[in-house]
């Protein structure tokens, strides 16, 4: 009887219906506390309700002094245990990143639920706004979208495959400097705002001419000196970064037309095929 009861309790404690699955975590500055933490959740279909139930996405935010405190408060608020094992995106606002994020990185990496492969993003808008606007336009699963969007850098060069694990490794390396994905909300979604970037190759997140169902974008790289954000690379600068890293399978560049000073020629460059 004792053995049966212990197994029954273990199953109940770890049952999917007792967990709150976080797919994105955002960290902003707070007016009242140290930080404002945004959790983006998915509610998977209940095993009792069949597979036809749609997955729902929602966000909750808490002002607190640390990430562990935020998790503890949210555990109480939701009456479920926060689970970070499915967290795909970790987002910092520019303001937080400029002040240093090493303490947050160490805290998250010490949590055995956090995947080292989680994307790490610095947002030109607030992390809360970035997460709330991250609605996949083609994918039916938001986790699928979070998994695949960095891979577009292989054929565009405009986004990097930056993860919290790589960021941590660069922090503890004396000869390395960390970097992140540069995210943001398209300028066209802001009332009366338009992109003022004169050249397509100089666009970056928060200053691009893109408009569509999903207002978030990921173009460029956030550059760090140790744990502080010190600069941002635009599209063509990110392409150059990938060329140096040998991370590209193909990319497009525009060069001036020698015969027409008002025109440019688009070239798609790819490695030479070997026989």
What does each model-found stretch correspond to?
Residues 4-275:
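Membrane-proximal alpha-helical signals and transmembrane carboxylates
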